[in-house]
Amino acid sequence: TAMFSVSLSLIPLFTEKGMTYELAALALGLLGAGQVIGRLLYMVIPHTAAPWVPLVTTTGLSAFSIALLALVPGPPWLLISIGILAGAVRGAQTLVQGSAAADRWGTRNYGAINGIIAAPLTIVTAFGPSLGPLLAVATGSYSSMALMAVGLALVALIFARFS
């Protein structure tokens, strides 16, 4: 949810840092391209580690890339590059989430098990589009909201290790 909220708030985050609306919108599109890169990278890496390792890795990289988005003031080319990195992490995270049940419990009853895992995550994620702007207003900036998202990602990192 942290990565989702920040991703959806990328345009106001980047305009707050001085980008034009058009360039920030292009950056959001390139974040989407980064998701494809992350999914392709996930497909080619070996999957021999313990099941919790991919989740911890993508969650840690989420916290790192969100922190960069929050703290780096510019220039635009660097912010866009960080956005692409965040997209790659988000893309890989999608596949990690999709394979989590099978990696831990096999493919028997995959649909039921994955549904149990995905249901609470889907409910929380549904609030992502509104939580980002609400937190930005409450904290005074989208950068502050992104820093709060880093905190959430770090809490998720602790839980991910014991999943």
Model-derived features: positions:
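Interfacial helix-cap and linker-helix signal at transmembrane-aqueous boundaries
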Residues: 14-15, 45-46, 131-140
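A membrane-interface helix-boundary motif in multi-pass transporters
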Residues: 134-152
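Extracytoplasmic gate region of multi-pass secondary transporters
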Residues: 1-40, 128
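Intracellular juxtamembrane helix-capping segments at the cytosolic ends
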Residues: 92-105
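Multi-pass alpha-helical transporter architecture, strongest
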Residues: 150-163
